[in-house]
């Protein structure tokens, strides 16, 4: 059983609120979960402390048991200083493709 810490959407249409839950990865996003760890309200200002509420003791316990955080929850945990998130790196993104290189060289020659 692969256990993840992720966001489950709640709230109404156009006014989302997310519960931070521990769930089996096979369960639906908003479906069954094992335990609720907190909530996230994206409509609140970023500097408001009520925007994100997490029970850090429970989070640390689930991480110790092997639960994997989702990308968004990993950002929250990195900000809180609980778990360091490795930076994403794509060095080939800025390298032009072969065709573009050939076109640029041809244009430079003449």
Swiss-Prot record:
SUPFAM superfamilies reported for this sequence: Ribosomal protein S16
Annotated disulfide bonds: none
Source superkingdom: Bacteria
Disordered: annotated span: 82-110
Sample GO molecular function, one term: structural constituent of ribosome
Compositionally biased residues, Basic and acidic residues: 82-103
GO cellular component terms, A-Z: cytoplasm; small ribosomal subunit
GO biological process: translation
Pfam families, alphabetized: Ribosomal_S16
Keywords carried by this UniProt record: Ribonucleoprotein, Ribosomal protein
HAMAP family linked to this entry: Ribosomal_bS16
PANTHER family (UniProt xref): 30S RIBOSOMAL PROTEIN S16 (PTHR12919), SMALL RIBOSOMAL SUBUNIT PROTEIN BS16M (PTHR12919:SF20)
Family affiliation: Belongs to the bacterial ribosomal protein bS16 family.
Record protein name field: Small ribosomal subunit protein bS16
Organism: Bradyrhizobium sp. (strain ORS 278)
Organism phylogeny: Bacteria, Pseudomonadati, Pseudomonadota, Alphaproteobacteria, Hyphomicrobiales
């Amino acid at each position: 059983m692969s256990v993840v810490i992720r966001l489950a959407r709640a709230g109404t249409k156009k006014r989302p609120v997310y519960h931070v839950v521990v769930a089996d990865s096979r369960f639906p996003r908003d479906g069954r979960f094992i335990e609720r760890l907190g909530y996230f309200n994206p409509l609140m200002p970023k500097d408001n402390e009520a925007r994100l509420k997490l029970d850090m003791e429970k989070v640390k316990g689930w991480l110790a048991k092997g639960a994997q955080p989702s990308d968004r929850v990993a950002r929250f945990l990195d900000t809180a200083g609980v778990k360091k998130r490795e930076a994403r790196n794509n060095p080939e993104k800025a390298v032009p493709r072969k065709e573009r290189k050939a076109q640029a060289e041809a244009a430079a020659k003449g």
